[in-house]
């Protein structure tokens, strides 16, 4: 494959690189997934929240008296803290939380970590919108991938220098790391349709040359063709759907194969690196060094991993420039004008997609559910780690082991859920509901700790550290199902030809919502001094999307999507004409379209 083996297709725009995809380029694609996925799982999903909490803890005082240092070494101070803790327990306020002062605000160390991640995800959502157009247009694709990879990895490595006295710096570095990670994945994902389109397997298929061009090049088309009659509209729809169904045999299968392989490589590497990190923590903890140094060393190692594998990835990937955008959207210097043009185009595209999505009732229903669902999933992960660290007093090695168990269970879940679906002939939304019901067990089990008779047992309701590991297995199994089924279910509801725009909206909804839950949990912890009450909020948050997911009508959503796709292609001069769209009816016309679509 290295030399291609298929003739070059005609370029669709000036300066398009139509050279066949090579093994070297595919290795570059997989290599960056290997680099960044490790940081996403090992750092963001495990060690970053623990490190932030521990850095702050070493500068904090106990919540119960707001005087005693949390990491006091003096015997007298420790004795006084123990007495205070026993008195607090007798009063029914068992807490191990510490408080710190951040820019004049009094926060618990756990809420400090939650607020940091809330801010990180919010900034990431804003950045993803602005970067989305750059990923599909112009010549900055490879440069930005290298820039985000370099900036994010170096920021992670700088944690080695963050001592407890400057713990707030760790918060800023976390924001930079998370934003760079998200943006680099957007850039990397923009390579996938191009690698598929230029792959020799696809180029050699002469049966559907038009279908290849249906692979999204930009978030949303700025111009549409002239208006046709209603009859012509449906004829165009039938042709496009027929072409798309044929294209699935090669384009979609190849895309799925490449994407699945990349995810598999990334997760296997993440588990392996997680094991290495546990060894680093175990060895360094035996030396009696500062309690934060082993964690900071682990982040340095994970950041170095990210940087190391980013270098060959950038070397092996081609530039693959996209179609340029007009820079007349903003007046000013050339560089500033270009940056503003890309940013304005991205936000305009998002707004246009939102207006279309609002007209598609089933899409809107799912996106509301997805907003709640993704927020619940992101929040429960961070909450569980901090609960294990602060309430259950688990060490860093034990928390890292919990992350490995959850990740491994996720891989198993991705395999098991399709088997369950086939065995019991469950629809996709039914599988999602089953996953949510299973996930609901996690906060409900934590709430059992409030019951007096459970407290009298001394076990149950997450009173012992070992109880969290079975819950980690449940969480991992659920994530293995949700991560794949939600995306595929959403894909059934979006208009054909607008995949890039609607999946961008899907990702932005995910990241935007994930900033809400951690902030609310942080407020709860600040008010109560405990994390356990936050399980009540999480139980409600997980339950809310269940009826919404159940209500989504896939067949009606597909009908509406096809009709909207036709309407979008027949509006005059790109002006939106969606006000008249009222959703599908029960008529035979829609049924005929669905038969063509199937």
UniProtKB/Swiss-Prot annotation:
| Topology term for the membrane | Multi-pass membrane protein
Name the domain of life this protein comes from: Eukaryota
Which regions are flagged for Low complexity bias? 212-224
Disulphide bridges:
none
Chief localisation class: membrane
Give a Pfam family name: ATG22
Q: Where is the composition biased (Basic and acidic residues)?
A: 227-238, 585-598
Q: Where is carbohydrate linked to this protein?
A: 74, 80, 285
**What biological-process terms (Gene Ontology) are attached?**
amino acid transmembrane export from vacuole; autophagy
Q: Which UniProt keywords apply?
A: Amino-acid transport, Autophagy, Glycoprotein, Membrane, Transmembrane, Transmembrane helix, Transport, Vacuole
Localization per record:
Vacuole membrane
Q: Which InterPro entries match?
A: Atg22 (IPR044738), Atg22-like (IPR024671), ATG22/LtaA_families (IPR050495), MFS_trans_sf (IPR036259)
Chain intervals for the UniProt region annotation (Disordered): 1-20, 207-238, 575-598
Q: Which residues cross the membrane?
A: 28-48, 111-131, 159-179, 182-202, 263-283, 297-317, 363-383, 400-420, 431-451, 465-485, 489-509, 534-554
Q: Name one GO cellular component term.
A: vacuolar membrane
Explain the purpose of this protein: Vacuolar effluxer which mediate the efflux of amino acids resulting from autophagic degradation. The release of autophagic amino acids allows the maintenance of protein synthesis and viability during nitrogen starvation.
Family named by the database record: Belongs to the ATG22 family.
The protein in question is named Autophagy-related protein 22-1
Q: Which organism is it from?
A: Sclerotinia sclerotiorum (strain ATCC 18683 / 1980 / Ss-1)
- Source lineage: Eukaryota, Fungi, Dikarya, Ascomycota, Pezizomycotina
Task: Write the gene name.
Answer: atg22-1
């Amino acid at each position: 494959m290295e030399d291609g083996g298929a003739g070059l297709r005609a370029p669709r725009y000036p300066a398009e690189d139509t050279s066949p995809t090579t093994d070297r380029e595919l290795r570059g694609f997989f290599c960056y997934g290997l680099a960044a996925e490790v940081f996403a799982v090992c750092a963001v999903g495990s060690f970053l929240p623990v490190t932030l909490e521990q850095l702050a803890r070493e500068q904090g005082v106990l919540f119960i008296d707001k005087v005693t240092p949390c990491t006091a070494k003096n015997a007298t101070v420790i004795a006084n803290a123990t007495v205070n803790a026993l008195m607090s327990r007798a009063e029914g306020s068992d807490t191990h939380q510490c408080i710190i002062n951040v820019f004049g605000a009094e926060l618990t160390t756990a809420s400090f970590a939650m607020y940091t991640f809330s801010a990180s995800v919010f900034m990431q959502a804003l950045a993803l919108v602005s970067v989305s157009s750059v990923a599909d247009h112009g010549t900055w694709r490879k440069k930005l991938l290298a820039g985000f990879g370099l900036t994010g990895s170096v920021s992670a490595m700088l944690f080695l220098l963050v001592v407890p006295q400057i713990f707030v710096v760790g918060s800023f570095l976390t924001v930079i790391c998370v934003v760079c990670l998200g943006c680099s994945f957007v850039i990397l994902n923009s390579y996938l349709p191009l690698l598929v389109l230029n792959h020799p397997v696809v180029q050699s298929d002469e049966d559907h040359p038009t279908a290849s061009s249906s692979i999204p090049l930009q978030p949303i088309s700025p111009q549409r063709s002239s208006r046709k009659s209603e009859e012509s509209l449906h004829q165009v729809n039938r042709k496009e759907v027929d072409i798309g169904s044929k294209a699935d045999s090669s384009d979609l299968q190849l895309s799925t194969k490449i994407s699945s392989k990349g995810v598999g490589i990334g997760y296997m590497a993440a588990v392996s690196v997680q094991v290495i990190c546990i060894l680093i923590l175990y060895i360094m903890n035996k030396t009696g060094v500062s309690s934060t140094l082993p964690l900071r060393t682990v982040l340095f190692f994970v950041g170095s991993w990210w940087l190391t594998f980013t270098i060959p990835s950038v070397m092996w990937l081609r530039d693959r420039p996209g179609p340029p955008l007009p820079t007349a959207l903003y007046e000013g210097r050339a560089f500033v004008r270009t940056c503003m043009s890309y940013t304005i185009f991205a936000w305009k595209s998002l707004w246009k997609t939102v207006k279309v999505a609002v007209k598609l009732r089933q899409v809107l229903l799912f996106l509301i559910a997805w907003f709640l669902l993704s927020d619940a999933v992101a929040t429960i992960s961070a909450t569980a780690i901090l609960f294990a660290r602060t309430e259950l007093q688990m060490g860093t090695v034990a928390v890292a082991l919990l992350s490995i168990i959850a990740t491994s269970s996720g891989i198993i879940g991705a395999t098991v859920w399709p088997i369950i679906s086939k065995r019991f002939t469950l629809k996709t939304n039914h599988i999602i509901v089953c996953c949510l019901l299973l996930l609901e067990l996690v906060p409900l089990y934590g709430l059992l700790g409030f019951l007096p008779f459970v407290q009298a047992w001394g076990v149950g309701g997450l009173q012992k550290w070992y109880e969290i590991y079975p819950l980690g297995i449940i969480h991992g199994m659920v994530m293995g199902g949700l991560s794949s089924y939600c995306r595929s279910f959403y894909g059934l509801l979006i208009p054909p030809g607008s995949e890039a725009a609607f999946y961008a909206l899907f990702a932005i909804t995910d990241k935007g919502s994930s900033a809400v839950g951690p902030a609310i949990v942080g407020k709860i912890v600040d008010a109560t001094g405990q994390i356990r009450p936050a399980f009540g909020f999480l139980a409600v948050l997980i339950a809310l999307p269940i009826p919404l997911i159940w209500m989504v009508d896939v067949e009606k959503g597909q009908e509406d999507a096809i009709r909207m796709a036709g309407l979008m292609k027949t509006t005059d001069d790109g002006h939106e004409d969606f006000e008249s769209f009222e959703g599908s009816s029960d008529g035979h016309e829609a049924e005929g379209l669905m038969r063509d679509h199937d």
